[in-house]
Curated annotation (Swiss-Prot):
Family annotation (CDD domains): TFP_snake_toxin (cd00206)
Coiled-coil blocks: none
General function of this protein: Has low cytotoxic activity.
Record's keyword terms, sorted: Disulfide bond, Membrane, Secreted, Target cell membrane, Target membrane, Toxin
Summary of the tissues where the protein is detected: Expressed by the venom gland.
Subcellular location per the Swiss-Prot or TrEMBL entry: Secreted; Target cell membrane
Name by which UniProt lists this protein: Cytotoxin 11
SUPFAM superfamilies in UniProt: Snake toxin-like
Disulfide bonds, paired cysteine numbers: 3-22, 15-40, 44-55, 56-61
Keyword Glycosyltransferase among record annotations: no
Length: 62
């Protein structure tokens, strides 16, 4: 699996074994959904009051 790991959409890394999800974290309050954190995960991180987390399982989907 390949996941983006920076705010730039053309930079990505190959996830280590066991991390089969990509995630993207954005701030809920901003009108522009600029990712503040991206990467690989074994389980999907939880969203919070300020942060929205979206997970997916295909190459470069985050």
């Amino acid at each position: 699996l390949k996941c983006h790991n920076t705010q730039l959409p053309f930079i990505y890394k190959t996830c280590p074994e066991g991390k089969n999800l990509c995630f993207k974290t954005t701030l809920k309050k901003l009108p522009l959904k600029i990712p503040i954190k991206r990467g690989c995960a074994a389980t999907c991180p939880k969203s919070s009051a300020l942060l929205k987390v979206v997970c997916c399982s295909t190459d470069k989907c985050n």
